[in-house]
Protein backbone atom coordinates (compact mmCIF):
# COMPACT_ATOMS: atom_id res chain seq x y z
CA UNK A 1 0.00 0.00 0.00
CA UNK A 2 2.89 2.28 0.79
CA UNK A 3 4.42 1.84 -2.64
CA UNK A 4 1.09 2.50 -4.35
CA UNK A 5 0.58 5.74 -2.52
CA UNK A 6 4.12 6.82 -3.26
CA UNK A 7 4.08 5.85 -6.92
CA UNK A 8 0.92 7.84 -7.49
CA UNK A 9 2.66 11.00 -6.29
CA UNK A 10 6.20 10.31 -7.43
CA UNK A 11 5.86 11.89 -10.86
CA UNK A 12 8.68 14.09 -12.12
CA UNK A 13 8.69 17.48 -10.44
CA UNK A 14 10.61 20.69 -10.59
CA UNK A 15 10.25 23.83 -8.51
CA UNK A 16 10.53 27.50 -9.39
CA UNK A 17 10.91 30.34 -6.89
CA UNK A 18 9.28 33.54 -8.11
CA UNK A 19 12.12 36.04 -8.32
CA UNK A 20 11.80 39.66 -9.48
CA UNK A 21 10.96 39.72 -13.20
CA UNK A 22 9.08 36.40 -13.18
CA UNK A 23 5.99 38.05 -14.74
CA UNK A 24 7.23 37.86 -18.34
CA UNK A 25 8.70 34.35 -18.49
CA UNK A 26 10.24 31.54 -16.45
CA UNK A 27 13.10 29.17 -17.23
CA UNK A 28 12.75 25.39 -16.92
CA UNK A 29 15.67 23.85 -14.96
CA UNK A 30 18.35 22.45 -17.23
CA UNK A 31 18.38 18.97 -15.66
CA UNK A 32 14.61 18.58 -15.93
CA UNK A 33 14.56 19.93 -19.48
CA UNK A 34 17.26 17.54 -20.72
CA UNK A 35 15.66 14.51 -19.05
CA UNK A 36 12.01 15.01 -19.98
CA UNK A 37 11.45 17.75 -22.57
CA UNK A 38 14.42 18.17 -24.88
CA UNK A 39 13.52 17.33 -28.48
CA UNK A 40 9.81 16.98 -27.73
CA UNK A 41 8.61 20.56 -27.35
CA UNK A 42 9.53 22.03 -30.74
CA UNK A 43 6.56 23.94 -32.16
CA UNK A 44 4.34 22.90 -29.26
CA UNK A 45 2.82 24.66 -26.29
CA UNK A 46 2.84 23.46 -22.72
CA UNK A 47 -0.44 23.07 -20.87
CA UNK A 48 -0.67 24.23 -17.27
CA UNK A 49 -3.42 23.28 -14.82
CA UNK A 50 -4.00 24.10 -11.17
CA UNK A 51 -6.53 23.48 -8.42
CA UNK A 52 -7.53 27.15 -8.48
CA UNK A 53 -9.48 26.88 -11.72
CA UNK A 54 -10.67 24.40 -14.32
CA UNK A 55 -8.99 26.39 -17.09
CA UNK A 56 -6.09 24.79 -18.98
CA UNK A 57 -3.52 27.43 -19.84
CA UNK A 58 -1.50 27.08 -23.04
CA UNK A 59 2.03 28.45 -22.70
CA UNK A 60 4.50 28.76 -25.57
CA UNK A 61 7.85 27.01 -25.03
CA UNK A 62 10.88 28.75 -26.52
CA UNK A 63 13.86 26.54 -25.72
CA UNK A 64 13.86 26.29 -21.92
CA UNK A 65 11.65 29.35 -21.52
CA UNK A 66 7.89 29.48 -20.97
CA UNK A 67 6.93 32.78 -22.62
CA UNK A 68 3.67 33.67 -24.38
CA UNK A 69 0.73 32.94 -22.11
CA UNK A 70 2.78 32.77 -18.92
CA UNK A 71 1.97 36.35 -17.90
CA UNK A 72 -1.77 35.62 -18.05
CA UNK A 73 -1.27 32.53 -15.88
CA UNK A 74 0.74 34.51 -13.31
CA UNK A 75 -1.83 37.32 -13.15
CA UNK A 76 -4.78 34.91 -12.84
CA UNK A 77 -3.11 33.19 -9.89
CA UNK A 78 -1.99 36.47 -8.34
CA UNK A 79 1.58 35.19 -8.05
CA UNK A 80 4.00 37.28 -6.04
CA UNK A 81 7.75 37.51 -5.52
CA UNK A 82 8.96 34.79 -3.09
CA UNK A 83 6.14 32.39 -4.00
CA UNK A 84 7.27 28.89 -4.94
CA UNK A 85 5.66 26.84 -7.70
CA UNK A 86 5.84 23.06 -7.91
CA UNK A 87 5.42 21.79 -11.49
CA UNK A 88 4.30 18.16 -11.62
CA UNK A 89 4.84 16.58 -15.03
CA UNK A 90 1.70 14.64 -16.02
CA UNK A 91 3.09 13.48 -19.36
CA UNK A 92 3.76 15.01 -22.80
CA UNK A 93 3.73 18.77 -22.14
CA UNK A 94 1.04 18.79 -19.46
CA UNK A 95 1.94 20.16 -16.01
CA UNK A 96 -0.03 20.49 -12.81
CA UNK A 97 1.10 23.61 -10.93
CA UNK A 98 0.82 24.01 -7.15
CA UNK A 99 1.69 27.42 -5.65
CA UNK A 100 3.29 27.64 -2.19
CA UNK A 101 3.89 30.67 -0.01
CA UNK A 102 7.16 31.56 1.68
CA UNK A 103 6.16 29.40 4.67
CA UNK A 104 5.91 26.42 2.27
CA UNK A 105 2.16 26.06 2.82
CA UNK A 106 -0.02 25.68 -0.24
CA UNK A 107 -1.85 28.82 -1.29
CA UNK A 108 -5.65 28.44 -1.23
CA UNK A 109 -7.78 30.22 -3.83
CA UNK A 110 -11.41 31.25 -3.49
CA UNK A 111 -13.67 32.52 -6.29
CA UNK A 112 -15.23 35.84 -5.27
CA UNK A 113 -17.81 36.64 -7.89
CA UNK A 114 -18.73 39.93 -6.28
CA UNK A 115 -15.09 41.01 -6.17
CA UNK A 116 -13.89 39.70 -9.49
CA UNK A 117 -12.10 42.49 -11.21
CA UNK A 118 -11.86 42.89 -14.96
CA UNK A 119 -8.84 44.76 -16.19
CA UNK A 120 -8.63 46.80 -19.38
CA UNK A 121 -7.93 43.69 -21.43
CA UNK A 122 -11.07 41.98 -20.22
CA UNK A 123 -9.23 39.31 -18.25
CA UNK A 124 -10.68 38.13 -14.98
CA UNK A 125 -8.32 37.85 -12.00
CA UNK A 126 -8.87 35.80 -8.87
CA UNK A 127 -8.39 36.90 -5.30
CA UNK A 128 -5.82 34.86 -3.43
CA UNK A 129 -6.44 33.93 0.19
CA UNK A 130 -4.17 32.09 2.58
CA UNK A 131 -6.08 30.96 5.65
CA UNK A 132 -4.36 32.01 8.84
CA UNK A 133 -5.97 29.87 11.52
CA UNK A 134 -4.13 26.76 12.64
CA UNK A 135 -6.96 24.43 11.70
CA UNK A 136 -7.17 25.43 8.08
CA UNK A 137 -3.63 26.48 7.23
CA UNK A 138 -2.03 24.18 4.70
CA UNK A 139 -5.21 22.12 4.69
CA UNK A 140 -4.58 20.69 1.25
CA UNK A 141 -0.99 19.77 1.98
CA UNK A 142 -1.26 18.32 5.47
CA UNK A 143 -0.20 14.91 4.27
CA UNK A 144 1.77 16.02 1.21
CA UNK A 145 4.02 19.00 1.77
CA UNK A 146 7.42 20.48 0.89
CA UNK A 147 10.32 20.97 3.31
CA UNK A 148 13.50 22.92 2.46
CA UNK A 149 16.94 21.76 3.54
CA UNK A 150 18.40 24.90 5.09
CA UNK A 151 21.63 25.73 6.89
CA UNK A 152 19.66 26.47 10.06
CA UNK A 153 17.67 23.22 10.25
CA UNK A 154 20.88 21.33 9.54
CA UNK A 155 22.69 23.16 12.30
CA UNK A 156 19.98 22.56 14.93
CA UNK A 157 19.31 19.04 13.57
CA UNK A 158 15.53 19.56 13.38
CA UNK A 159 12.64 20.91 11.31
CA UNK A 160 8.96 21.70 11.90
CA UNK A 161 6.01 19.98 10.25
CA UNK A 162 3.10 22.19 9.04
CA UNK A 163 0.53 23.17 11.67
CA UNK A 164 -2.23 21.39 9.77
CA UNK A 165 -0.33 18.13 10.16
CA UNK A 166 -1.21 18.19 13.86
CA UNK A 167 -4.95 17.71 13.31
CA UNK A 168 -5.57 16.29 9.85
CA UNK A 169 -2.89 13.60 10.02
CA UNK A 170 -4.52 12.03 13.06
CA UNK A 171 -1.15 11.86 14.82
CA UNK A 172 -1.36 11.84 18.60
CA UNK A 173 0.39 14.64 20.44
CA UNK A 174 1.96 11.91 22.55
CA UNK A 175 3.89 10.49 19.57
CA UNK A 176 7.61 10.60 20.29
CA UNK A 177 9.02 8.88 17.18
CA UNK A 178 8.56 9.14 13.43
CA UNK A 179 9.92 7.04 10.56
CA UNK A 180 11.34 8.61 7.40
CA UNK A 181 11.68 6.37 4.31
CA UNK A 182 14.08 7.53 1.60
CA UNK A 183 14.11 6.80 -2.13
CA UNK A 184 15.92 3.49 -1.57
CA UNK A 185 13.26 2.31 0.92
CA UNK A 186 15.66 2.65 3.85
CA UNK A 187 13.83 3.60 7.07
CA UNK A 188 15.26 6.03 9.63
CA UNK A 189 13.69 6.54 13.06
CA UNK A 190 13.81 10.14 14.29
CA UNK A 191 12.65 11.93 17.43
CA UNK A 192 9.21 13.58 17.23
CA UNK A 193 7.96 16.06 19.81
CA UNK A 194 4.93 18.31 20.03
CA UNK A 195 5.34 22.02 20.74
CA UNK A 196 2.25 23.19 22.59
CA UNK A 197 2.93 26.92 22.16
CA UNK A 198 3.17 26.74 18.36
CA UNK A 199 0.77 23.78 17.93
CA UNK A 200 3.31 22.04 15.68
CA UNK A 201 5.35 18.86 15.60
CA UNK A 202 9.14 19.08 15.46
CA UNK A 203 11.31 16.34 13.94
CA UNK A 204 14.76 16.19 15.54
CA UNK A 205 17.77 14.01 16.44
CA UNK A 206 18.60 12.45 13.11
CA UNK A 207 17.44 14.96 10.50
CA UNK A 208 20.98 16.10 9.66
CA UNK A 209 22.25 12.51 9.50
CA UNK A 210 19.31 11.58 7.24
CA UNK A 211 20.10 14.42 4.82
CA UNK A 212 23.81 13.57 4.87
CA UNK A 213 23.07 9.89 4.19
CA UNK A 214 20.98 10.74 1.13
CA UNK A 215 23.12 13.60 -0.18
CA UNK A 216 20.50 16.32 0.48
CA UNK A 217 22.40 19.59 0.69
CA UNK A 218 21.41 23.11 1.67
CA UNK A 219 19.07 24.51 -0.99
CA UNK A 220 17.33 21.22 -1.76
CA UNK A 221 13.55 20.92 -1.46
CA UNK A 222 12.01 17.64 -0.35
CA UNK A 223 8.43 16.48 -0.92
CA UNK A 224 7.18 14.62 2.14
CA UNK A 225 4.16 12.31 1.99
CA UNK A 226 2.39 10.82 5.02
CA UNK A 227 1.89 7.16 4.09
CA UNK A 228 0.92 5.71 7.46
CA UNK A 229 -0.71 7.10 10.59
CA UNK A 230 -0.65 5.68 14.08
CA UNK A 231 1.54 5.70 17.15
CA UNK A 232 4.64 5.99 14.94
CA UNK A 233 3.81 7.90 11.72
CA UNK A 234 5.64 7.01 8.51
CA UNK A 235 6.71 9.67 5.99
CA UNK A 236 7.97 9.02 2.47
CA UNK A 237 10.57 11.50 1.22
CA UNK A 238 11.94 12.25 -2.22
CA UNK A 239 13.70 15.33 -3.65
CA UNK A 240 12.18 17.79 -6.08
CA UNK A 241 14.13 18.85 -9.15
CA UNK A 242 16.20 21.93 -8.44
CA UNK A 243 16.64 25.04 -10.55
CA UNK A 244 20.41 25.32 -10.35
CA UNK A 245 20.31 28.89 -11.68
CA UNK A 246 17.91 30.45 -9.18
CA UNK A 247 17.37 28.21 -6.17
CA UNK A 248 20.63 29.21 -4.48
CA UNK A 249 19.59 32.85 -4.47
CA UNK A 250 16.19 32.01 -3.05
CA UNK A 251 17.54 29.63 -0.41
CA UNK A 252 19.56 32.48 1.13
CA UNK A 253 16.36 34.37 1.84
CA UNK A 254 14.67 31.22 3.11
CA UNK A 255 17.64 30.68 5.42
CA UNK A 256 17.26 34.16 6.91
CA UNK A 257 13.53 33.70 7.51
CA UNK A 258 13.82 30.29 9.14
CA UNK A 259 17.04 31.11 10.98
CA UNK A 260 15.41 34.01 12.83
CA UNK A 261 12.78 31.75 14.38
CA UNK A 262 15.12 28.90 15.26
CA UNK A 263 17.99 31.02 16.62
CA UNK A 264 15.80 31.95 19.59
CA UNK A 265 15.12 28.27 20.26
CA UNK A 266 18.82 27.46 20.01
CA UNK A 267 19.81 30.16 22.50
CA UNK A 268 17.19 28.84 24.92
CA UNK A 269 18.57 25.31 24.55
CA UNK A 270 22.11 26.57 25.20
CA UNK A 271 21.13 28.30 28.44
CA UNK A 272 19.05 25.36 29.68
CA UNK A 273 21.92 23.00 28.81
CA UNK A 274 24.36 25.06 30.89
CA UNK A 275 21.97 25.08 33.86
CA UNK A 276 21.53 21.31 33.67
CA UNK A 277 25.28 20.84 33.48
CA UNK A 278 25.94 23.10 36.49
CA UNK A 279 23.27 21.35 38.53
CA UNK A 280 24.81 18.01 37.61
CA UNK A 281 28.22 19.10 38.84
CA UNK A 282 26.87 20.53 42.11
CA UNK A 283 24.26 17.90 42.94
CA UNK A 284 26.31 14.71 42.86
CA UNK A 285 30.05 15.41 43.31
CA UNK A 286 30.70 11.75 44.12
CA UNK A 287 30.05 10.83 40.53
CA UNK A 288 32.52 13.37 39.18
CA UNK A 289 35.75 11.88 37.97
CA UNK A 290 39.18 13.34 38.58
CA UNK A 291 41.10 15.10 35.85
CA UNK A 292 43.79 12.48 35.74
CA UNK A 293 45.37 11.29 32.56
CA UNK A 294 42.82 8.52 32.09
CA UNK A 295 39.71 10.70 32.57
CA UNK A 296 41.14 13.78 30.89
CA UNK A 297 42.56 12.91 27.50
CA UNK A 298 42.99 14.22 23.97
CA UNK A 299 41.43 12.77 20.81
CA UNK A 300 42.42 13.87 17.28
CA UNK A 301 39.81 14.31 14.56
CA UNK A 302 41.24 12.28 11.69
CA UNK A 303 40.06 11.33 8.22
CA UNK A 304 40.07 7.71 9.36
CA UNK A 305 37.84 8.04 12.42
CA UNK A 306 35.52 10.30 10.43
CA UNK A 307 35.29 7.74 7.65
CA UNK A 308 34.58 4.88 10.07
CA UNK A 309 32.37 7.06 12.29
CA UNK A 310 34.18 5.76 15.40
CA UNK A 311 37.25 6.18 17.63
CA UNK A 312 38.89 4.32 20.53
CA UNK A 313 39.00 5.57 24.11
CA UNK A 314 42.30 5.15 26.01
CA UNK A 315 42.88 1.73 27.55
CA UNK A 316 43.39 3.29 30.96
CA UNK A 317 39.78 4.47 30.95
CA UNK A 318 38.65 0.86 31.38
CA UNK A 319 40.23 0.38 34.80
CA UNK A 320 41.06 3.73 36.39
CA UNK A 321 37.65 5.33 35.80
CA UNK A 322 35.68 2.28 36.85
CA UNK A 323 33.74 2.43 33.60
CA UNK A 324 31.44 -0.57 33.37
CA UNK A 325 32.14 -2.91 30.48
CA UNK A 326 28.38 -3.35 30.11
CA UNK A 327 27.84 0.29 29.10
CA UNK A 328 26.13 0.54 25.71
CA UNK A 329 25.63 4.31 25.43
CA UNK A 330 27.71 7.40 26.17
CA UNK A 331 26.73 11.08 26.25
CA UNK A 332 28.89 13.80 24.69
CA UNK A 333 28.31 17.35 25.96
CA UNK A 334 29.71 20.11 23.75
CA UNK A 335 30.74 23.66 24.68
CA UNK A 336 27.18 24.97 24.34
CA UNK A 337 25.75 22.39 26.71
CA UNK A 338 24.10 20.37 23.93
CA UNK A 339 24.06 16.62 24.49
CA UNK A 340 24.51 13.85 21.92
CA UNK A 341 23.99 10.14 22.65
CA UNK A 342 26.45 7.78 20.91
CA UNK A 343 26.94 4.02 20.92
CA UNK A 344 29.64 2.56 23.17
CA UNK A 345 31.10 -0.94 22.84
CA UNK A 346 33.82 -2.81 24.73
CA UNK A 347 36.39 -5.07 23.02
CA UNK A 348 37.73 -7.89 25.19
CA UNK A 349 40.70 -8.51 22.89
CA UNK A 350 41.84 -4.85 22.96
CA UNK A 351 40.62 -4.13 26.51
CA UNK A 352 39.29 -0.76 25.41
CA UNK A 353 36.06 1.02 24.56
CA UNK A 354 35.02 2.21 21.10
CA UNK A 355 32.66 5.13 20.46
CA UNK A 356 30.68 4.76 17.24
CA UNK A 357 27.51 5.75 15.36
CA UNK A 358 27.33 9.49 15.88
CA UNK A 359 30.94 10.60 16.14
CA UNK A 360 30.99 11.96 12.60
CA UNK A 361 27.69 13.80 13.06
CA UNK A 362 28.91 15.26 16.38
CA UNK A 363 32.06 16.64 14.74
CA UNK A 364 30.03 18.01 11.83
CA UNK A 365 27.57 19.70 14.20
CA UNK A 366 30.36 21.44 16.12
CA UNK A 367 32.58 22.09 13.07
CA UNK A 368 35.46 19.97 14.37
CA UNK A 369 37.40 19.33 11.16
CA UNK A 370 40.17 16.88 10.34
CA UNK A 371 43.33 17.96 12.15
CA UNK A 372 41.57 19.33 15.23
CA UNK A 373 42.40 18.00 18.70
CA UNK A 374 39.64 17.67 21.29
CA UNK A 375 39.99 17.43 25.05
CA UNK A 376 37.57 14.88 26.57
CA UNK A 377 36.79 14.93 30.28
CA UNK A 378 34.79 12.20 32.01
CA UNK A 379 32.49 14.18 34.33
CA UNK A 380 30.00 11.49 35.30
CA UNK A 381 30.26 7.73 35.58
CA UNK A 382 27.45 5.22 35.71
CA UNK A 383 25.21 3.27 33.37
CA UNK A 384 25.53 6.04 30.75
CA UNK A 385 28.84 7.94 31.17
CA UNK A 386 29.03 11.66 30.35
CA UNK A 387 32.00 13.25 28.58
CA UNK A 388 32.52 16.98 28.24
CA UNK A 389 34.26 17.90 25.00
CA UNK A 390 35.93 21.08 23.87
CA UNK A 391 38.70 22.00 21.41
CA UNK A 392 42.20 21.81 22.82
CA UNK A 393 43.67 25.20 23.72
CA UNK A 394 46.16 26.22 21.11
CA UNK A 395 49.71 27.26 21.82
CA UNK A 396 51.00 30.26 19.86
CA UNK A 397 48.88 30.47 16.70
CA UNK A 398 47.05 27.10 16.57
CA UNK A 399 47.49 23.37 16.77
CA UNK A 400 48.49 21.78 13.48
CA UNK A 401 45.45 21.58 11.25
CA UNK A 402 46.34 18.38 9.45
CA UNK A 403 48.77 15.49 9.52
CA UNK A 404 51.00 16.99 6.83
CA UNK A 405 51.66 20.06 8.92
CA UNK A 406 52.37 17.89 11.95
CA UNK A 407 54.82 15.82 9.92
CA UNK A 408 56.61 18.93 8.69
CA UNK A 409 56.87 20.26 12.22
CA UNK A 410 58.27 16.96 13.51
CA UNK A 411 60.85 16.94 10.72
CA UNK A 412 61.75 20.54 11.49
CA UNK A 413 62.20 19.80 15.19
CA UNK A 414 64.30 16.75 14.33
CA UNK A 415 66.60 18.90 12.21
CA UNK A 416 66.75 21.47 15.00
CA UNK A 417 67.59 18.70 17.43
CA UNK A 418 70.52 17.57 15.29
CA UNK A 419 71.86 21.14 15.22
CA UNK A 420 71.62 21.35 19.00
CA UNK A 421 73.55 18.11 19.27
CA UNK A 422 76.30 19.48 17.06
CA UNK A 423 76.54 22.69 19.08
CA UNK A 424 76.77 20.72 22.29
CA UNK A 425 79.49 18.52 20.76
CA UNK A 426 78.21 15.46 22.51
CA UNK A 427 80.21 12.49 21.33
CA UNK A 428 78.61 10.19 23.88
CA UNK A 429 75.60 8.42 22.37
CA UNK A 430 74.04 8.16 25.82
CA UNK A 431 73.47 11.93 25.84
CA UNK A 432 71.09 13.71 23.51
CA UNK A 433 68.76 16.70 23.32
CA UNK A 434 64.96 16.59 23.22
CA UNK A 435 62.66 19.57 22.77
CA UNK A 436 59.11 20.21 23.94
CA UNK A 437 57.11 21.16 20.83
CA UNK A 438 53.51 21.89 19.94
CA UNK A 439 53.31 18.73 17.87
CA UNK A 440 54.73 16.27 20.40
CA UNK A 441 52.44 17.70 23.08
CA UNK A 442 49.44 17.45 20.78
CA UNK A 443 50.25 13.87 19.79
CA UNK A 444 51.46 12.93 23.31
CA UNK A 445 54.48 11.33 21.59
CA UNK A 446 58.21 12.08 21.86
CA UNK A 447 60.47 10.66 19.13
CA UNK A 448 63.96 9.82 20.38
CA UNK A 449 67.01 10.33 18.11
CA UNK A 450 67.73 7.56 15.64
CA UNK A 451 71.35 7.32 16.82
CA UNK A 452 70.04 6.01 20.14
CA UNK A 453 68.67 3.00 18.28
CA UNK A 454 71.85 2.50 16.29
CA UNK A 455 74.03 2.62 19.40
CA UNK A 456 72.18 -0.42 20.81
CA UNK A 457 72.10 1.19 24.26
CA UNK A 458 68.41 0.35 24.57
CA UNK A 459 66.94 -3.12 24.09
CA UNK A 460 64.36 -2.92 21.31
CA UNK A 461 62.09 -5.25 23.30
CA UNK A 462 61.72 -2.78 26.18
CA UNK A 463 58.16 -1.42 26.45
CA UNK A 464 58.45 1.01 29.36
CA UNK A 465 60.70 3.85 30.46
CA UNK A 466 60.78 5.63 33.83
CA UNK A 467 61.34 9.39 34.01
CA UNK A 468 62.48 10.88 37.33
CA UNK A 469 62.63 14.60 38.08
CA UNK A 470 65.03 16.38 40.43
CA UNK A 471 62.65 15.88 43.35
CA UNK A 472 62.71 12.13 42.87
CA UNK A 473 59.18 11.84 41.52
CA UNK A 474 58.82 9.23 38.78
CA UNK A 475 56.57 8.71 35.76
CA UNK A 476 56.20 5.39 33.97
CA UNK A 477 55.73 5.93 30.23
CA UNK A 478 55.29 3.59 27.30
CA UNK A 479 58.30 3.05 25.04
CA UNK A 480 57.89 1.67 21.54
CA UNK A 481 60.32 0.84 18.75
CA UNK A 482 59.33 1.27 15.11
CA UNK A 483 61.00 -1.04 12.61
CA UNK A 484 59.81 1.23 9.82
CA UNK A 485 61.55 4.39 11.07
CA UNK A 486 64.20 2.65 13.17
CA UNK A 487 63.50 4.96 16.12
CA UNK A 488 62.21 4.75 19.68
CA UNK A 489 59.28 6.89 20.77
CA UNK A 490 57.82 7.67 24.18
CA UNK A 491 54.01 7.55 24.26
CA UNK A 492 51.11 7.79 26.70
CA UNK A 493 52.35 10.15 29.35
CA UNK A 494 54.79 12.56 27.74
CA UNK A 495 52.26 15.38 27.76
CA UNK A 496 51.25 14.73 31.39
CA UNK A 497 54.92 14.73 32.41
CA UNK A 498 55.50 18.11 30.75
CA UNK A 499 52.37 19.61 32.30
CA UNK A 500 53.30 18.32 35.77
CA UNK A 501 56.75 19.90 35.52
CA UNK A 502 55.59 23.16 33.96
CA UNK A 503 57.32 22.55 30.63
CA UNK A 504 55.88 24.33 27.58
CA UNK A 505 56.78 24.40 23.87
CA UNK A 506 60.30 25.76 23.43
CA UNK A 507 61.88 24.07 26.46
CA UNK A 508 64.90 21.87 25.74
CA UNK A 509 66.23 18.89 27.72
CA UNK A 510 69.66 17.32 27.73
CA UNK A 511 68.99 13.62 28.29
CA UNK A 512 71.64 11.36 29.78
CA UNK A 513 71.09 7.62 29.78
CA UNK A 514 72.63 5.57 32.60
CA UNK A 515 72.50 1.82 33.31
CA UNK A 516 68.98 1.85 34.65
CA UNK A 517 68.36 5.57 34.70
CA UNK A 518 67.92 8.32 32.16
CA UNK A 519 69.29 11.71 33.21
CA UNK A 520 68.03 14.99 31.78
CA UNK A 521 69.50 18.50 32.16
CA UNK A 522 67.47 21.60 31.51
CA UNK A 523 69.22 24.96 31.67
CA UNK A 524 71.91 23.43 33.87
CA UNK A 525 69.49 21.71 36.24
CA UNK A 526 69.78 17.96 36.58
CA UNK A 527 66.69 15.87 35.87
CA UNK A 528 66.95 12.16 36.51
CA UNK A 529 64.53 9.92 34.69
CA UNK A 530 64.65 6.16 34.68
Swiss-Prot record:
Gene3D superfamilies (UniProt xref)? DNA-binding pseudobarrel domain (2.40.330.10)
> Record's SMART domains?
B3
Name one matching Pfam family: B3
Q: Where is the composition biased (Basic and acidic residues)?
A: 254-276
Q: Which UniProt keywords apply?
A: DNA-binding, Nucleus, Repeat, Transcription, Transcription regulation
Q: Which residues bind DNA?
A: 11-103, 144-241, 296-393, 431-530
Q: Which GO terms describe its molecular function?
A: DNA binding
Principal cellular location given in the protein's record: nucleus
Disulphide-bonded residues: none
Query: What PROSITE patterns does the database record attribute to this sequence?
Result: B3 (PS50863)
Q: Where in the cell does this protein reside?
A: Nucleus
Question: From what superkingdom does this record's organism come?
Answer: Eukaryota
A single GO cellular-component term from the record reads: nucleus
Annotated segments matching region Disordered: 251-276
Please state what the protein is called: B3 domain-containing protein REM-like 3
Amino acid sequence: MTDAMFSSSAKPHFIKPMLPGFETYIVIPKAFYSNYLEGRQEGNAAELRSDATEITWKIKIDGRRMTKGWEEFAVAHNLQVDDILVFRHEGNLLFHVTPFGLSFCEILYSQRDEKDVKDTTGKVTRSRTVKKNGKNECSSVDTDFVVPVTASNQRVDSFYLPRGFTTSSGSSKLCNEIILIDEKDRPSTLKLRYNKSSNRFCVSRGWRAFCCRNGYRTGCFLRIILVRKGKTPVLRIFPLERDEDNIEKHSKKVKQEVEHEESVKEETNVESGKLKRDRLLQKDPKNLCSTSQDTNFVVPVTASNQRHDSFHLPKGLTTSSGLSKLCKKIIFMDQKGRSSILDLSYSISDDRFTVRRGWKAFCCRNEHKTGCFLRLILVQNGKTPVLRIFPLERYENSIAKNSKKIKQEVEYESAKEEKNLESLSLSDNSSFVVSVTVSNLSEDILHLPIRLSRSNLLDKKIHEIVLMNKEGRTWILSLKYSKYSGRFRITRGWKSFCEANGQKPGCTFLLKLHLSMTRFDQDGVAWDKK
